[in-house]
């Protein structure tokens, strides 16, 4: 009787143990969404971004103030008009963390590279981002990068064009 009781007790204990929740992963549907997001940026498919974000998503890019997805799309299209050869050198590195509150956060690291239109000036910028997901959509984004390489490249291009213009004006005198 004692053995039956111990066996039954052991069986109950073994079957009642839950599999621990996996809190860290490098493969998930959310990570695939972030890879799709970066692919949309590379391809210039800014309208496709609407499918990845919730309607009321908060986007913080180098700012403490959030902006809506519509602004991200408009600004992306505008700035893309100055860039050709837009790509993420060496792809995107991602990991997902499920915190103690059950929130799904995807962290991504990218090395962005682009060439200014009308020149051979290349810009390379490392980007780090965090995305909070809810119901399969991005509800919050924090992205940070250094804008200085872009400013310097645009300033150099403007200086070159100004020098050419001054030279042309001098020749016309």
Regions found by a protein language model. Give the residues of each.
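Exposed beta-sheet edge and beta->alpha loop/turn motif
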Residues: 109-138, 145-148
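Hydrophobic pocket/interface hotspot
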Residues: 37, 48-50, 57, 72, ...
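Short, low-complexity N-terminal intrinsically disordered segments enriched in polar/charged residues
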Residues: 17-46, 51, 161-173
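Positively charged n-region of N-terminal signal peptides that target proteins for export
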Residues: 1-4, 19
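A solvent-exposed, acidic/Ser-Thr-rich amphipathic alpha-helical stretch
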Residues: 45-98, 104
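Low-complexity, intrinsically disordered terminal/linker segments enriched in charged
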Residues: 140-173
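Sec-dependent N-terminal signal peptides
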Residues: 4-14
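A short, structured loop/turn motif at beta-sheet edges
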Residues: 97-104, 132-139
């Amino acid at each position: 009787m004692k053995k039956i009781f111990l066996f039954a007790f052991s069986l109950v204990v073994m079957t009642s143990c839950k599999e621990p929740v996996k809190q860290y992963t490098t493969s998930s549907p959310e990570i695939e969404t972030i890879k799709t997001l970066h692919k949309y940026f590379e391809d210039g498919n800014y309208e496709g971004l609407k499918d990845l974000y919730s309607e009321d998503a908060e986007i913080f890019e180098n700012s403490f103030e959030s902006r809506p997805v519509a602004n991200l799309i408009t600004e992306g299209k505008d700035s893309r008009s100055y860039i050709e050869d837009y790509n993420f050198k060496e792809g995107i590195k991602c990991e997902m963390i499920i915190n103690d509150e059950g929130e799904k956060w995807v962290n991504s690291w990218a090395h962005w590279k682009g060439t200014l239109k009308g020149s051979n000036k290349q810009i390379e910028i490392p980007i780090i981002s965090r995305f909070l997901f809810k119901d399969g959509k991005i509800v919050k984004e924090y992205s940070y990068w250094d804008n200085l390489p872009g400013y310097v490249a645009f300033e150099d291009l403007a200086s070159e064009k100004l020098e050419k213009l001054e030279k042309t004006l001098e020749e016309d005198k």
